[in-house]
Swiss-Prot record:
Any Pfam family hit: YccV-like
InterPro entries noted in UniProt: Hemimethylated_DNA-bd_dom, Hemimethylated_DNA-bd_sf, HspQ
Species assigned in the record: Salmonella choleraesuis (strain SC-B67)
Full protein name: Heat shock protein HspQ
Family indicated by similarity: Belongs to the HspQ family.
Chief place where the protein resides: cytoplasm
Location in or out of the cell: Cytoplasm
GO MF term list: DNA binding
């Protein structure tokens, strides 16, 4: 079993670009069907580590879904981001859904 550093609903930052994002899914290793030429350059060790589906905002404030290696992310310590309230709301909504009890029929 591979342990992931970040959890679903957690806010993270891209370690090089500084973009704020929210983890929406986790793969235990690289799992896209057909890698692009840029993704082919990723070494095997990085491919074997967890990869994250992260929602970030583009320059126009529109949501963009990205696929990033664990090494490309760092924890975000602040919970409130007045400059990007939609990312705060997305993180809260996901965490709330994960904590909500599920009814069984």
């Amino acid at each position: 079993m591979i342990a992931s550093k970040f959890g679903i609903g957690q806010q993270v930052r891209h370690s090089l670009l500084g973009y704020l994002g929210v983890v929406v899914d986790i793969d235990p290793e690289y799992s896209l069907d057909e890698p692009s030429p840029d993704e082919l350059a990723v070494n095997d060790e990085l491919r074997a580590a967890p990869w994250y589906h992260v929602v970030m905002e583009d320059d126009d404030g529109q949501p963009v879904r990205t696929y990033l290696a664990e090494a490309q992310l760092r924890s975000e310590m602040r919970d409130e981001h007045p400059e990007q309230p939609s990312m705060d709301e997305l993180a809260r909504t996901i965490r709330k859904q994960l904590q909500a009890p599920r009814l069984r029929n």
